[in-house]
């Protein structure tokens, strides 16, 4: 039950991220890759007081082992599961964690990874504010699919710090491009694809909520990041303000059922019943999760550089 919940939540987070750090498919092999994701969130405008997390594949830790000494040396007699998964309590402003429940997926099958915006999408705050999603029509594509979790970039659209409204520059002084994550699989038809992405690019003249330096324009080149039909398992970086997890209280099946609520608010239905023919007694646990996206631009997919 817990494993299924972790996998489902990780998939939801992967698809609903708005940020990207690193080159798609490049392994994280240095702590600078982790710190870079933290720098991305700080530059975007994530509050410095927020806890920031970097969730990585267990094998990634082997690449970082040489730099691990002393990062988490303090150890009590009893440690929680969270503490056991923790690699570093604060590295580059990030809490680095390891997880075997990261979501992997196969990228879309289209080998044509470049297209053009057929028309300028709606980039107003009023349209995006409730979902932080945006619809774009991409043309001049080939055939195949664009998969949920694939990320796109639009030429000439770069990120702003949402607090200062200043252009974000990376370590080399280059502008950081805006990235959107495709929310559901799309089949290309007639060389066109209509995609809905998380982390909408918002731009209005003198707009107080702008998060990019220019609105996506008709004819702008759209790049689908990564290679076609390739298995990816991105690391995740995020803050507590990015996503929410709750549960739905399930009705009892019989009067003898129990609906328990954990200390952190998780509702679990417990049903106890018997199989007379098999002479066995069984207990069933049911949990119905509910996920929410608070701000996709406070989370991202992480790779190496």
Model regions: which residues?
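Core alpha/beta structural scaffold of self-assembling particle/tube/pore-forming proteins
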Residues: 2-305
